[in-house]
Regions:
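PRPP-associated nucleotide enzymes
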Residues: 1-196
Length: 196
């Protein structure tokens, strides 16, 4: 699994935190290599006004402050989710983890990476700036890992405050498509992606 590989390059027992909507994927990452990754604990509550009320488990805070590796599986697919994700990302980085990685499996604003008319806003650049504000971790800049970014030039929207890694899960897709195509008597896989 591509996300597990991005984490497994760090030391053992990386704490993986995640947005609640990413819980199934986070569990799959841990299941792929439970000796290298364990779930970090965080309470995702909300105040009456809807703003997040987040609390990182005390034992995990202690582990991070003592140099544990840390990663966050972000879910930035809706504007409503961005604030809570970023609040926790900033807090985790500030705890001083030896290494801190923000895993972005879907860069939702990525398809709006260029402008072709005066006044149009490249929201991909805005999201990159928000992620670029991630504080440094114990060893220096935090790392933002973006999967299957829409356009390679988007890596240059990030500032030098963070280290950016572009990864792809396309090889895994190719493997799965080949597996499906090899099934006897089964329909051939068809890939459709609407893009204007």
């Amino acid at each position: 699994m591509a996300l597990a590989l991005a984490i497994s390059t760090l030391a053992d027992a990386t704490l993986l935190f995640h947005h609640p909507s990413a819980a199934p994927l986070a569990r799959r990452v841990v299941d792929a290599d439970p000796s290298a990754v364990r779930l970090g604990g965080c309470s995702w509550q909300a105040f009456e006004d809807g703003f997040p009320n987040l609390t990182i488990d005390a034992a995990d805070v202690d582990a991070i402050e003592n140099g544990a590796e840390c990663a966050f599986l972000a879910c930035l697919d809706t504007p409503a989710a961005v604030f809570g994700n970023m609040a926790l990302i900033y807090a985790l980085a500030q705890l001083g983890a030896r290494h801190f990685r923000v895993l972005v499996p879907f860069f939702a604003t990525g398809t709006m990476e260029r402008v072709d008319a005066v006044g149009q806003v490249a929201t991909a650049a805005a999201m990159a700036r928000i992620l670029s504000a991630t504080p440094h971790c114990g060893s220096g800049p935090s790392t933002v890992v973006v999967y299957d970014v829409h356009a390679l030039q988007e890596q240059f929207y990030f500032s030098d405050n963070v280290h950016v890694q572009l990864k792809s899960a396309v090889p895994l897709l190719h493997e799965k498509l080949a597996e499906l195509a090899a099934r006897p008597g089964g329909p051939a896989p068809v890939v459709v992606y609407p893009d204007d």
